[in-house]
Amino acid sequence: MSIPQSKSSSNGFPLKRGETEEVLHKTNTSNTVFNGEAGSLKRLSLDRLVYFTTCKIGHHVEVHLRNGSVYTGIFHAANVEKDFGIILKMACLIKDGTLRGHKSRSEFVRKPPSKTFIIPADELVQVIAKDLSVSSNNMSNAVQGEKPSELLTDSSISQSYHVDRERQLQRWVPDETIPHGADLENVFDNPWNRKWNQFEVNKSLFGVKSTFDEDLYTTRLERGPQTKQLEEHAQKIAREIEAETTRDIHVAEERGLQLNENFDFDEEARYSSVRPVTGFGDSGFDLEDNALLDTCNDLTFGGSSTSDGQKPASSGKGCEELRVSGDSQSSRKNKNVDQSCSTSKQQSKDFPAAGSNISESQLDEQRRKNNEEVSHNNRSAEESTSGHGDIKEGAKSGGGASSVSKAVTEREREASQVSSKTKSESSFGQSASRSSESRPGPSTSSRPGLSPSSSIGSMASSEKSTLNPNAKEFKLNPKAKSFKPLQSAAAPPQSPIADASFYYPGPSHVPVQQMPGMPPVNYGLPPYPGNQPQMMYHPQAYYHPNGQPQYPQQQMIPGQQQQQMIPGQQHPRPVYYMHPPPYPQDMPYHNKGRE
């Protein structure tokens, strides 16, 4: 729609933004005076221009300027009193008329749009608005269509506003040319459609050469001797996943699973991604929910999880089985205790007492006898813990009580022998027997239905224990102070040098000096975590005992000089007086240097 040019005002844009919007909605102007027939025609054309301009407010328009530039934006306001200047919101330049060369539109789009853009009337050529509604009926329909509904489903979205809203969706029925069971996964693998290639069609029809590479979107398959095995393993995992139960309607539809008949749903609920509020019930999935929870409980805690109302009738039998398993476990523990006791006895017998003279043949024979006794005890323990039927029969018979009492007395006698022998054993034998005997046996008095062998084992293990029964329990005092031992006086350092006739250690009170000319230890280096040899310097020299005789540091007595003749030497050797160093009292080698 072309707009006639009008003369621009002297001051460019005289009215403000608010005044322009107010003038835009006026249909009659008080400043315009019409006289006669010409005035009435002018007024009619102005009213029509104002009406069309008002209809453009809020619409996307395209504005052409005198220099050839084109702007797009939202029509916001216009000045219809004097000139026809307009204002655009979010204006973008799509064509620049000042440039001679052609410039692509994408380069202008990259620039950020102007929030408010004013176009004067002297630069305006035309304003183009597409799909503009000028009738009242169309405007009312458009306003009603802009009202958003609370919930939009596929059926409401697909329906038009000009038709009935109760239209039902139609089921799609494939044509006869499409085979049965065709889906998106195998549609290109079918022989009837195998010749179709998307990239070849695009190249032949549109001349577009595709650079598609499936390795960019999927995992690259390494072809090799193990490819077939990997494919079979992947197919096995896929079958296991597809065989699992699901509560998702769409997943069940994809896998071809039959849903519960009690579940009421329509085509929209089956294929739509929008779940409506009404008409969707999951009452048919109550049993499946319970089964799913039971399965999860079985996987998490183990065993069979049943509700209170579905307890099996053989609950008493289950209790009996649990009791039997508990008895068998206790008997196994007591059997292990007996074996540990017998092992400790064997170790104590294998190591004779200190001071006894036993030959190797006698020691081997004693070990062989101990092994036979251990194997015999193990067999008897296995027979006693083989089952409840044997225990009950032995208890009913007359000799059962006597056999049990004999076994108890025999165990007591063996325990007393072991305790008497351990007093004269070696340290290794004592540690081995005490470590095995000090293990506390499991408490089986609180469990019902225990076997006699288990009670005997517990009695024997309790009698063999060397713990003090009258000892009191140790309780930690939270108010007690921490114990700090007193630092005793440092012992005098022992000389690491061998004792010799000419070695004189320095006095104990003289501090150790650093070797001259040597840098301090760890200078400029991190400390070494291990033991480091200390480099010390002592004023006293060390003389090797087997070397040439040397003389210690001597001091000349002023005014005294003696000579001593040694046989075999021509020159006399001077004798000097030497001050004796103060030796500490604890040194075992003091006075040895002057002998």
UniProtKB/Swiss-Prot annotation:
Q: Where is the stretch described as Disordered? A: 302-505, 536-595
Q: In chain numbering, where does the motif PAM2-like 2 fall?
A: 475-485
Q: Which PROSITE patterns match?
A: SM
Does the record bear Repeat in its keywords? yes
Residue ranges of every copy of the Sm domain listed in the record? 48-113
Record key words, sorted: Repeat
Query: Residue ranges under compositional bias (Polar residues)?
Result: 302-313, 326-346
For this UniProt entry, the molecular function terms from Gene Ontology, in alphabetical order, are:
mRNA binding
**Spans of biased composition, class Basic and acidic residues?**
364-382
Does the record bear Chaperone in its keywords? no
Per the Swiss-Prot or TrEMBL record, what residue ranges does the short sequence motif PAM2-like 1 cover?
466-474
Q: In which tissues is it expressed?
A: Expressed in cauline leaves, stems, rosette leaves, immature siliques and primary inflorescences.
The disulfide bonds in this chain are none
Q: Where is the composition biased (Low complexity)?
A: 416-465, 488-501, 548-570
Supply the SMART domains for this chain. Answer: LsmAD
User: Which InterPro entries does its entry note?
Assistant: ATXN2-like (IPR045117), LsmAD_domain (IPR009604), PAM2_motif (IPR009818), Sm (IPR047575), SM_dom_ATX (IPR025852)
In the UniProt entry, what is the domain comment?
A: Contains a tandem repeat of a PAM2-like motif, which seems to be involved in the binding to the PABC/CTC domain of PAB proteins.
Q: What protein is this chain from?
A: Polyadenylate-binding protein-interacting protein 4
The gene from which this protein is expressed is CID4
